[in-house]
Structure formats: structure tokens, C-alpha cells
Amino acid sequence: ESQAELSRGCPDSDLDGVTDPLDAFPSDPFQWADSDGDGFGDNTNVPSGDDCVDVFGKSFEEGRHGCPDADLDGYADVDDLFPEDQEQWADFDGDGWGDNYFWENTTVADDDNLGMFITLREQRGDAFPEIASQWSDIDGDGWGDNQSSSNRVDNFPLRVSQWNDFDADGFGDNAVAGAYQPDACPKVPGTSTANDEFGCPD
């Protein structure tokens, strides 16, 4: 029952002292007003209170409620490093690529082998959120495509089964079954290709 001066004796479902017709939150005893009409109460003394009482907003992440959130990802613009990208909000390594990594596989023609195809990734976000010098991994092997980096460099960015090339002869060091053109002489540079023996002196 409401105890407010002009509505004493009227229904007050949450018993906060504000009658239901005047209570913006009739079932919440800790909230009753919503100045900006964004659905977050003006009482900031509770965790769910509106942190931007006079400004409409829908943020709810990182403990900041009811503040402007242009991309509607839940993160207030002031906390969002990508305020216009709904998929991204953080960038741990500061390389300009968001930490949320998504990809879709796509099949393309293999330019090095006529009539063959390879599977590559169409990427969004940072494939290496903790390595500032790497962000892309188009073949999905866990090694980065940025050749100028000194960290986890993929010497074969289009070959999922190869990444290292110790002798720098263009043939990969991974010799497991099914690997692409494995180097039969991984510590000695070579150009051999006959009989599937790649990378030996010729």
C-alpha cells in the first residue's frame, strides 16, 4: 500500500512507497523512476541502476547500465573500442583488430596446382588476440600471415599443413602423411621435385 502523500492507500505491489500507476518499476522495490525512459531505474545505489540517468542508453555490460551504446552490443560507447561494430568491443593486444574471432570456410582454386582447390577462411576479428603483430590466419593452421612479424610467422599462409621452412627453399618442414610437398632435406636447401622428393639438392 502506497504511503506517498497524494496516493496513500493505493496499490503498491513492490511496497516501495510509490503507487503502481506512478511507479516505472512496479515489481522492483529498489526502482520507481526512469527519467530517460531507457528501462534502467534512476536509483544508482543498486547494481542495476542507470549510470547515465539523464541520457537514454541500453548498455548493460561491464557494470555500466543505461548508457549510450551505438552498436547495441551491450557495451557502453565509452567502454567500447569498436562503438560502431556490434561484433567487437575489446582489443587486448592493441593492434586494431577486435578480440572476437569469427570465420567461414570458403573453397578457392589452387593457383599452384591446376584443377585443384584449397580451403581458406573468410575472417572477422583477430586470430591472435594476444599477439600484436599477428591477426590473420587465412589457412587456419594457427600460424600468422604477417610476414614482417617475429612471432608465429606462417611461411606458407595458404597451406594448412605447412608453416616452417628451416632452409628457406620453399618446401615446408612438416613431413607427416598428407602434408603439402614436405621437404625431404629440411636442413639443406634444394629444388628437387621428382618422385615426390621435394627440397633436396638438384
Language model segments and positions:
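Extracellular calcium-associated, cysteine-rich motifs in secreted modular proteins
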Residues: E1-D202
